[in-house]
């Protein structure tokens, strides 16, 4: 096989080396206690023995960013989509009570463009910094024929640790009378984008809407909020009984994941500010108001269940909204009261 045969097939090995060189400085920023070795090994290593955890339980999560990625590609804006990828993973594991330890990413692309991929990984590193996780490894696969040259996909994998006695088990601990606090989202986050793209398919994404204070594309690409640093201290103080990350499926699919079958979450509409982008989606997409709660976070990215006696103090600490309470099971697991 000739020297340039691989390049002729569409795989640029030298560009791959350049990507690794470019991303090292971003990865280095995320280093934390426990990381062993440097980027470039066959596997990332982490020393659990340095952690002050008596009965460690490892909790892992993996996710991508869905078709929000298509908007980033369309806008040629790649510096924040990595934050979304980290957020989707670490917000899931913090819901189980885990402190994120490390993260790995996977990028598949049709053509290895070092400048673009550096932006993507810089976003991943920023997400890791926000979560307190180390970026200890990853994979960039150049796959001509599988993807168009400008296209790429992004996924990630997070591992966290929890003290066994501090695991969040809402099915066991959440009870009727508990107060539900909602933590504000930064926007749509990373779910429902196939519908979002359809609703706004005929709009100029560089323009704004009467409902928005910035361009539509900037609104749609606002990175997912990471809730780790807000929630972790309270988890360690045993102040939280249940956590629901409001992702795909909105309130109706995600709230029931944090309590048992004998309970319902009673949500009071109007107890928080629904973000303008959701009002725009409902209006321009002709989506039934009730269905919005089955798809989107509606301005609440995370819901926690707390004991009534702790609710007021935690509401202030978290700058949260009191959005409802737990009640004995009614007709459905989630009831939206107007």
From Swiss-Prot:
Predominant localisation class: cytoplasm
EC number, as in UniProt: 6.3.3.1
Gene Ontology biological-process annotations: 'de novo' IMP biosynthetic process; adenine biosynthetic process
One MF term in the entry's GO annotations: ATP binding
Catalytic activity: 2-formamido-N(1)-(5-O-phospho-beta-D-ribosyl)acetamidine + ATP = 5-amino-1-(5-phospho-beta-D-ribosyl)imidazole + ADP + phosphate + H(+)
CDD domains given in the database record: PurM
Compartments where found: Cytoplasm
InterPro entries documented for this protein: PurM-like_C_dom (IPR010918), PurM-like_C_sf (IPR036676), PurM-like_N (IPR016188), PurM-like_N_sf (IPR036921), PurM_cligase (IPR004733)
Keyword Nuclease: no
Pathway field: Purine metabolism; IMP biosynthesis via de novo pathway; 5-amino-1-(5-phospho-D-ribosyl)imidazole from N(2)-formyl-N(1)-(5-phospho-D-ribosyl)glycinamide: step 2/2
Keywords: ATP-binding, Cytoplasm, Ligase, Nucleotide-binding, Purine biosynthesis
GO cellular component: cytosol
Similarity annotation: Belongs to the AIR synthase family.
Name this polypeptide is given: Phosphoribosylformylglycinamidine cyclo-ligase
Organism of this sequence: Lactococcus lactis subsp. lactis (strain IL1403) (Streptococcus lactis)
Gene name for this UniProt entry: purM
């Amino acid at each position: 096989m000739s020297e340039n045969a691989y390049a002729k097939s569409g795989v640029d090995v030298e560009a791959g080396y350049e990507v690794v060189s470019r991303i090292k400085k971003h990865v280095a920023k995320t280093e934390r206690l426990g990381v062993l070795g440097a980027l470039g090994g066959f596997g990332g290593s982490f020393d659990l023995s340095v952690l002050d955890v008596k009965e460690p339980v490892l909790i892992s999560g993996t996710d991508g960013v869905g078709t929000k990625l298509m908007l980033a590609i369309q806008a040629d804006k790649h510096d924040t989509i990595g934050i979304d990828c980290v957020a989707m993973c670490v917000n899931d594991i913090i819901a189980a009570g885990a402190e994120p330890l490390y993260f790995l990413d996977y990028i598949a692309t049709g053509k290895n463009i070092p400048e673009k991929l550096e932006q993507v990984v810089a976003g991943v590193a920023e997400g890791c910094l926000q979560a307190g996780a180390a970026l200890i490894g990853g994979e960039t696969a150049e796959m001509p024929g599988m993807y168009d040259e400008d296209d790429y996909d992004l996924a990630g994998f997070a591992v966290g640790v929890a003290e066994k006695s501090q695991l969040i088990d809402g099915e066991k601990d959440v009870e009727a009378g508990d107060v539900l606090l909602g933590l504000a989202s930064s926007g749509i986050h990373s779910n429902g984008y196939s519908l979002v793209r359809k609703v706004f398919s005929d709009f100029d994404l560089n323009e704004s809407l009467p409902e928005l204070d910035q361009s539509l594309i900037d609104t749609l690409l606002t990175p997912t909020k990471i809730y780790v640093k807000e929630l972790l201290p309270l988890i360690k103080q045993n102040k939280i009984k249940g956590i629901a990350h409001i992702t795909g499926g909105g309130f109706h699919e995600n709230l029931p994941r944090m309590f048992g079958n004998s309970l319902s979450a009673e949500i009071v509409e109007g107890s928080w500010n629904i973000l303008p982008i959701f009002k725009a989606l409902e209006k321009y997409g002709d989506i039934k108001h009730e269905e919005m709660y089955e798809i989107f976070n509606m301005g609440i990215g995370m819901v926690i269940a707390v004991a009534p006696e702790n609710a007021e103090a935690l509401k202030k600490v978290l700058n949260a909204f009191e959005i409802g309470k737990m009640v004995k099971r009614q007709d459905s697991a989630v009831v939206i009261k107007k």
